[in-house]
């Protein structure tokens, strides 16, 4: 754990700080200093648990599936985000959680300057394609990167929609039917049969790509 012997103390203080600024908290949950149930017990409605499908240390699965604390956290409004990253995603854990119906609220990549070209992650579309290979539908995946994300972050009706009068930020995709091999840092592999590819990007009504 990155917090070492400090345990949950940094998280407790972070929650207090977030409350003082009336803002939400984003929490890196990989390899937590305690159980995931303990970690999410500190989180409030609107706080975001990142790396929800990580496989390092304690995770969201217990002996009987999704742990009770994780279920309760979702019920009280904690947001669960994929935040895949280079090493914060386990294919078996994600597949089991999705099988149980524990889908992400939002889908993001955790891309940064060090992992932007890594084969495990590479792009948001690759992450979306991977989740489709695990059982999520195209519509479920699209909502979690558009309208649902906009609603959670207070931009409903402004972003993540094609409604008349809204900002025309649009990505045109093609769902190519082909065999795709997905991997994670633990050397787990998954074969999918479709890959989302970008065909055009429109920004504020202007063709960009």
Question: PLM ranges: what are they?
Answer:
Residues 1-118:
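Active-site core of metal-dependent hydrolases
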Residues 8-9, 64, 88, 122, ...:
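Residue-level recognition of alpha-helix initiation/capping sites
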Residues 38-43, 71-82, 126-135, 156-160, ...:
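Short secondary-structure transition/capping segments
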Residues 45, 164, 204:
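Short glycine-rich loop/turn motifs that provide flexible caps or phosphate-binding loops at active sites
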Residues 55, 86, 147, 176, ...:
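Short, solvent-exposed coil/turn elements at secondary-structure transition points
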Residues 92-176:
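His/Asp/Glu-enriched, well-ordered alpha-helical/loop segment
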Residues 167-209:
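C-terminal cap of metal-dependent C-N hydrolases
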